[in-house]
Amino acid sequence: MSQIVTRFAPSPTGFLHIGGARTALFNWLYARHTGGKMLLRIEDTDRQRSTKEAIAAIIEGLEWLGITCDGDPIYQFARAERHRAAVEEMLAKGNAYRCYATPQELDEMRELARKEGRPPRYDGRWRDRDPSEAPKDRDPVIRLRAPQEGETVIDDMVQGTVTFPNKDLDDLVLLRSDGNPTYMLAVVVDDHDMGVTHVIRGDDHLTNAARQTQIYRALGWEVPRMAHIPLIHGPDGAKLSKRHGALGVDAYRDMGYLPAALRNYLVRLGWSHGDQEVFSTEEMVSFFDLDKVGRSAARFDFQKLESLNGHYMRASSDAELLSAIDALVPHLPDAEHRLARMTPERRAQLAAAMPGLKERAKTLVELVDNAEFIFVERPLPLDDKAAALLSPEARAHLARLVPALEQVEWTAAATEAAVRAYAEAQGVKLGAVAQPLRAALTGKPTSPPIFDVLMVLGRDESLARLKDQAA
């Protein structure tokens, strides 16, 4: 069997959509699973909406997710001459024809179809007209001479056998009157020339598959295998849209999700391997196959993604998380200020605090927020809950506790022993002392273990913060 070749073919009119990212992942996994290749084609024929920034965002998003394409990207617009040459082949074979119908005539066809309650279709009026009847003052479009009887059958690797009556498929336009190729034509020619053997894409392209199959046959080319995967819906069952939340991969990066976690989450949207939920990349490549992709739409569950991300954070080494934070910070609000604060000393403190921080955070952004106590300057700002913990009685405890802490060796065990001894001597529960201690040291009611915080901040900074809040 020849090598399997898949492709991901986004339109560069915006960010890398989360649905597109999953399509790219499925193409990549199938190619890697079969020892094949995955190619990237940028479908930039919409010149008004295609931008260099969008192309860069797509490539950057794929790289961030760990999806690597084979070879350089192929740009569809640059291949327009090749697309036109393919149409000339079809004209020469009699499988395409010139159509001179005016926009007004096409509007009338649509209106008649609407009145008769049927789908709008081109009526084929120029299909068999004598070329001598062609008006001299009008540039034609080129249409496919599609079969009018029988069926076009798609043997889809996910959807099964899908049949389209040819009477429902009209003679689609291949070249516009300005000579520019249509999407339908360009996709077929590019997939053929790129050697694509398997087209894996969203099931909203299923009708396109029938039309493109007809173009393949008109050109005398082998039709690739097709797999139309289910769309992603929001938690409410409606097609995923802006009202459900973030749509772009870049937004998930900026919210602090790890690429491995998002990759793992996306692979489970429509594909399964028993009851397993967490997969290493190696396991995904080993297990992935199209016969395990379901037909029904997958629902995007933000809470499940967050929980999975928390799992990946806890499983990451402290060094890996530090590197991930380094990559994230430039994308955060106030990035310049955050970068300026990341001195070698603060970085070392962040590394020391990481074991406790990663146990409590579900995203990198949450982790960075929880680590803010390392970076803030005195006097420490308190959030409302922390301020509420620092009652006059609590502040009095801090004032009496400081001298005891000043006398001990600065280790987690020694400071904990001193605080416990103080609470016992005062006849109060440990929480009555530890909670105000946490509020004074971090400005928040939650943090890594408080005695770890004392070690991260060090003796001088810890005592200074406690004195700031003591009565």
Curated annotation (Swiss-Prot):
Keywords, in A-Z order: Aminoacyl-tRNA synthetase, ATP-binding, Cytoplasm, Ligase, Nucleotide-binding, Protein biosynthesis
Gene3D superfamilies attached to this UniProt entry: 1.10.10.350, HUPs (3.40.50.620)
Subunit structure and binding partners: Monomer.
Catalytic activity reported: tRNA(Glu) + L-glutamate + ATP = L-glutamyl-tRNA(Glu) + AMP + diphosphate
Top-rank taxon: Bacteria
Positions of disulphide bridges: none
Protein location: Cytoplasm
GO biological process terms held by the UniProt record: glutamyl-tRNA aminoacylation
Motif ('HIGH' region): 10-20
Sites where the protein binds ATP: K242
Record organism: Xanthobacter autotrophicus (strain ATCC BAA-1158 / Py2)
Name of encoding gene: gltX1
Catalytic class of the enzyme: ligase
Enzyme Commission designation: 6.1.1.17
Short name of any one Pfam family annotated for the protein: tRNA-synt_1c
Renumbered residue ranges of the record's region Disordered: 113-140
Entry protein name: Glutamate--tRNA ligase 1
InterPro entries in UniProt: aa-tRNA-synth_I_cd-bd, aa-tRNA-synth_I_codon-bd_sub2, aa-tRNA-synth_I_CS, aa_tRNA-synth_I_cd-bd_sf, Glu-tRNA-ligase_bac/mito, Glu/Gln-tRNA-synth, Glu/Gln-tRNA-synth_Ib_cat-dom, GluQ/Sye
